[in-house]
Amino acid sequence: MSERKEGRGKGKGKKKERGSGKKPESAAGSQSPALPPRLKEMKSQESAAGSKLVLRCETSSEYSSLRFKWFKNGNELNRKNKPQNIKIQKKPGKSELRINKASLADSGEYMCKVISKLGNDSASANITIVESNEIITGMPASTEGAYVSSESPIRISVSTEGANTSSSTSTSTTGTSHLVKCAEKEKTFCVNGGECFMVKDLSNPSRYLCKCQPGFTGARCTENVPMKVQNQEKAEELYQKRVLTITGICIALLVVGIMCVVAYCKTKKQRKKLHDRLRQSLRSERNNMMNIANGPHHPNPPPENVQLVNQYVSKNVISSEHIVEREAETSFSTSHYTSTAHHSTTVTQTPSHSWSNGHTESILSESHSVIVMSSVENSRHSSPTGGPRGRLNGTGGPRECNSFLRHARETPDSYRDSPHSERYVSAMTTPARMSPVDFHTPSSPKSPPSEMSPPVSSMTVSMPSMAVSPFMEEERPLLLVTPPRLREKKFDHHPQQFSSFHHNPAHDSNSLPASPLRIVEDEEYETTQEYEPAQEPVKKLANSRRAKRTKPNGHIANRLEVDSNTSSQSSNSESETEDERVGEDTPFLGIQNPLAASLEATPAFRLADSRTNPAGRFSTQEEIQARLSSVIANQDPIAV
């Protein structure tokens, strides 16, 4: 136990010894004299404008309690009055002054001062800021000291530690220097408008600096700066303007193209519509033209089986006790056409006559010449004055014939254009084939030979023209005698009774019946709606011997002309055979001049035995006129 106490006591004694040992050392140190802090020398700097500079102020002693202060041209730089581009940083034993983006205003003398209990110390440095592109060059020796500036010199202390970011070259110098403008004589040192400066240094000879204009460089501003875009903002604006211009042009072209396409589509549609309308109008016009060319849409009867039934009934009612009228039917059928060796066949029907044999017979004869003449209508029919119309009436009197001949002579040319002329008739007829037409006359075997049945006058059929024979002995039209077999059959097949009203005793004695009437029927004659009203009133039976129509007691009685002298049966038969021979030898429309032929045939009508009419006799001149009326204008070669 006593050892531990000793040990403790020993330890305590050691600590005391240590503490007592230090105290005499500090006492000894405090007794030595203390030295004030000393600053290291700062170096002056020269730099171009816009560069970064750093000034450092350091002490050589290790004294901790030190304060640093910075001054510029004798003015303290504190937070209130220091520029924004100058910053002061404090570190242990040193202080730094940083200048960012130095400018000419930053040039001057900077001083650093250290303050402590032991003492104070200071150090200074000059900072020279030069514009860019200025190069310090040496002047010749002859010019040194020749210039004395009246301006106060500027001392520049340049430190080698400064950072120079300028493109111009610089030389570091020690000591102070002066930068003044060149005199008038030395301004020619810089060319191309450069500004001249002179740097004076006590230790070094004076030098000249040149501040060049934009676009030039070099020691004397003799070199040209390479071509480059100096202002980037202007270049960007120009580029943007160009881009906008090109974009606007492209958009305008696109809009124009779209408008062109739309306009083309619209015009194409309109053109298509117009073409469709034109096509429809052309189709309608073609249809109308075809309808006009084809005529009205009414069914036409087929030409293979044409049946024409003409029924004519007298409007004046006659008692059945006196007159029995029968309707005449004329039937044409193409299935029963008969072909002959000649060009045409004309069917001629004659009413029942008795040639001194006391019997009424129906004669069916065929001649080999077609002379179709329905009626002759004067051109004055269409005039406003309503001129008379001449027509050939089978039952008319001499007055009608004379008036007809008069008007026919007055207008020979206008007749050719009449719808009743041979041109129209021959154009619608084909006289190559004819079908026989049976004409049944209601007659009785007991009737006198001079009597004629009334239906002959009541029938109105297209009236053919008659050919005039140049022979003296021919006084009747060209006929073919019906065979006896056919005569007997017809005589037996049509027995009829006549009323006493039709019996004329004045014609019983010494009179021959009139020449047989003939009816020329064309097999292909078409009665259209246009010509039916004009042809119906003029379709009358005609013969070389005229019959006169009389109206006794309101009834129609047709009496034929008969000859006053009766001829023998042999002479009549001879004349019929001669007529048959002449009819066979007569060509179709052989007479070219009807007027000359009728004049040549004039003696043929001057016979001793003249045929008389109960109402009056025809003179020879009237018979000639009747012949002329039957053949007028039917020999037109153009119509044939």
From Swiss-Prot:
Regions of compositional bias (Gly residues) in chain numbering: 387-397
Keywords noted in UniProt: Cell membrane, Chromosomal rearrangement, Disulfide bond, EGF-like domain, Glycoprotein, Growth factor, Immunoglobulin domain, Membrane, Nucleus, Secreted, Transmembrane, Transmembrane helix
Effect of K181E: Defective in integrin-binding and in inducing ERBB3 phosphorylation. No effect on ERBB3-binding, defective in integrin-binding and in ternary complex formation with ERBB3 and integrins, and defective in inducing NRG1-ERBB signaling
Residue ranges crossing the lipid bilayer per the database entry: 243-265
Modifications the protein undergoes after translation, according to the UniProt entry: Proteolytic cleavage close to the plasma membrane on the external face leads to the release of the soluble growth factor form. N- and O-glycosylated. Extensive glycosylation precedes the proteolytic cleavage.
GO BP of this protein: activation of protein kinase B activity; activation of transmembrane receptor protein tyrosine kinase activity; brain development; cardiac muscle cell differentiation; cardiac muscle cell myoblast differentiation; cell communication; cell differentiation; cell population proliferation
Pro-peptide region(s): 1-19
Record field: compositional bias (Low complexity): 334-350, 563-574
GO molecular function: chemorepellent activity; cytokine activity; ErbB-3 class receptor binding; growth factor activity; integrin binding; nickel cation binding; protein tyrosine kinase activator activity; receptor ligand activity
Disulfide bond positions: C57-C112, C182-C196, C190-C210, C212-C221
Cytoplasmic topological segments: 266-640
UniProt function note: Direct ligand for ERBB3 and ERBB4 tyrosine kinase receptors. Concomitantly recruits ERBB1 and ERBB2 coreceptors, resulting in ligand-stimulated tyrosine phosphorylation and activation of the ERBB receptors.
Protein name per UniProt: Pro-neuregulin-1, membrane-bound isoform
Organism field: Homo sapiens (Human)
